[in-house]
Amino acid sequence: MKESLLAKSVRIAAVVAAYWTISISLVFLNKYLLSSPDIKLDAPLFVTWYQCVVTVICLFFLSLLGDRYPWIDTFPAFHIKLSVAKQVLPLSAVFVGMITFNNLCLKNLGVSFYNVGRSLTTVFNVICTYVILGQSTSYKAVICCAVIIGGFLMGVDQEGSSGKISYSGVLFGVLASLCVSLNAIYTKKFIPAVDNNIWRLQLYNNFNACFLFLPLMALLGEIGEVAHFPNLSSAYFWLMMTIGGVFGIAIGYITGLQIKVTSPLTHNISGTAKACVQTIMSVSYFHETKTALWWLSNAMVLGGSMAYTRVRHSEMKKAHTIQASKDDKALQEDGQTKV
């Protein structure tokens, strides 16, 4: 039976609302876990490691549910091959860098400035695509990147003028942006090793991360920090940590669902709008006062990102049309030759 327009609209609205709720909640929850005076645990790698452990456990139970309930067909059977885990290890190393620098950025920067601190992902996408894949970018896309860079620099300047900036947090944000770009590129390279299943790839990435984090935590002294943590036996602490891990896998699922019920373009626009609302919520919640130039820097970053999305979508659509036209012409010529 064909779905009515009203039912389809309600379903899309529900998915987008769920994406916004989970994404914004995850950012605020991670900020709370990483730098709240209530928690007082200076072990960001441990927090990130635990979320990876929770993700692996969640994928295990979701695979069991998938066997029992056929409508849950997104999650593959839980099976780990050490040969495959070793094969995707380079990608897992980039994945560890991505989530580590992301959380370190959030720990050292306010939620309101977090989007600006992480805004260079698009710029690194263009750079890495050219350097690694040898693919050039149109001048329109480069202009969009220039706007993003301008917004980033203005934001850093304005945040610095307020005396609240952490330049280490900015550096972590830049490194996180680089790792996000590298992760996207290497995902395409390694996903065939897991039968092109993004959830199986997430399983192997998080499985490898559980072990890759251990020497890093030992090197930075976080194991001792956790061992002497006064709230280690607190049920509330572990509840918040576990919720953070569950939300981590939930955002992956709801992101894929939002793309499925809308489109990649709509998903990116939704993400940009969500970032704007998240910034306003943070400024309001923490009672922050920002200058007009600070708001302008955010607008430049968000506007440049949205414009880049539109430009790339238009270019991909045009390239697809040209390729389809060439294929049709080739088929016609082939048919005439056979006649």
Curated annotation (Swiss-Prot):
The lineage of its organism: Eukaryota, Metazoa, Cnidaria, Anthozoa, Hexacorallia. Keywords: Golgi apparatus, Membrane, Sugar transport, Transmembrane, Transmembrane helix, Transport. This is GDP-fucose transporter 1. Antiporter specific for GDP-l-fucose and depending on the concomitant reverse transport of GMP. Involved in GDP-fucose import from the cytoplasm into the Golgi lumen. The keyword Transmembrane applies. GO terms for biological process: GDP-fucose import into Golgi lumen. The gene is slc35c1. The keyword Transmembrane helix applies. Residues 325-339 have a biased composition (Basic and acidic residues). Belongs to the TPT transporter family. SLC35C subfamily. It catalyses: GMP(out) + GDP-beta-L-fucose(in) = GMP(in) + GDP-beta-L-fucose(out). It comes from Nematostella vectensis (Starlet sea anemone). It is a multi-pass membrane protein. Residues 319-339 are annotated as: Disordered.
